[in-house]
């Protein structure tokens, strides 16, 4: 799934 972290201003894809 896609997880976005606003406070780090980035998105990662982990299932």
From Swiss-Prot:
Keywords from the named record: Calcium channel impairing toxin, Disulfide bond, Ion channel impairing toxin, Knottin, Neurotoxin, Secreted, Toxin, Voltage-gated calcium channel impairing toxin
Assigned GO CC terms: extracellular region
Primary localization: secreted
Tissues/organs with expression: Expressed by the venom gland.
Subcellular location: Secreted
GO MF entries: calcium channel regulator activity; toxin activity
Keyword set includes Disulfide bond: yes
Protein purpose: Modulates Cav2.1/CACNA1A voltage-gated calcium channels (P/Q-type currents) in rat cerebellar Purkinje cells and hippocampal CA1-CA3 neurons. At saturating concentrations (>10 nM) decelerates activation kinetics and slightly increases peak amplitude without affecting deactivation kinetics. In vivo, does not cause death when intravenously injected into mice. In rat models, through its activity on Cav2.1/CACNA1A, has an ameliorative effect on memory defects provoked by hyperstimulation of N-methyl-D-aspartate receptors (NMDARs) in the hippocampus.
Family assignment from sequence similarity: Belongs to the neurotoxin omega-lctx family.
Other facts noted in the record for this chain: The primary structure of this fragment is identical to that of Omega-lycotoxin-Am1a from Alopecosa marikovskyi (AC P85079).
Domain notes: The presence of a 'disulfide through disulfide knot' structurally defines this protein as a knottin.
Protein name in UniProt: Omega-lycotoxin-Lp1a
Organism for this UniProt entry: Lycosa praegrandis (Wolf spider)
């Amino acid at each position: 799934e896609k997880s976005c972290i606003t406070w780090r201003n980035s998105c990662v894809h982990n299932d």
